Amino acid sequence: MLCRQNWSERCETELNNHIAREYSASLSYHMLASYFDRDDVGLTKLVDYYSKASLEEREHADQFMKYQTKRGGIVQMNNVNPVKISLESPDDIVNAFKLALNLEKTINNYLLKL
C-alpha cells in the first residue's frame, strides 16, 4: 500500500476494534433513547440525552475511521453489537445511567491502552 505511513497491522486491527466499540456504544445509546421514547415511558429529556450521546459516539467512530484511512489502513467493522439492555423495572433510569457510565469507562480504558 503506497500511502501507508508507519501504520502496522496491529495498529490497524486495534483501531478497527475501537471503531467497532464506538459504534456499539452508539447503538446502545440509540436503544436507550428508543426505550425512553416509548409511549408508556415517555421521558423526553432522556430521549434527547441518549440521542445526543448516540450521535457523539458515532461521530467519534467517524473520526477514527478518517484517521485509519489517512494512515493507509483499511476500515473493517467486526463485532458491532449493542450492549444487552433489559429495562422493565422502576429502576430503569438508574440502570440506564449505570450502563452509560460503564460504556464510557470501558471506551476510555480501551483508548488509554491504544
Walk through the language-model features, giving the residues of each.
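Disorder-to-helix initiation segments
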Residues: 1-19
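Conserved alpha-helical segments that form or flank metal/cofactor-binding pockets of metalloenzymes
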Residues: 30, 38-80
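Conserved helix-loop functional segments at active or binding sites
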Residues: 35
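Residue preference for a single heptad-register face of alpha-helical coiled-coils
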Residues: 14-17, 21, 42, 49
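Acidic/histidine-rich alpha-helical segments that form the ligand environment
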Residues: 18-21, 25, 32, 80-114
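Juxtamembrane/interface segments of multi-pass membrane proteins
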Residues: 7, 39-45, 87-92
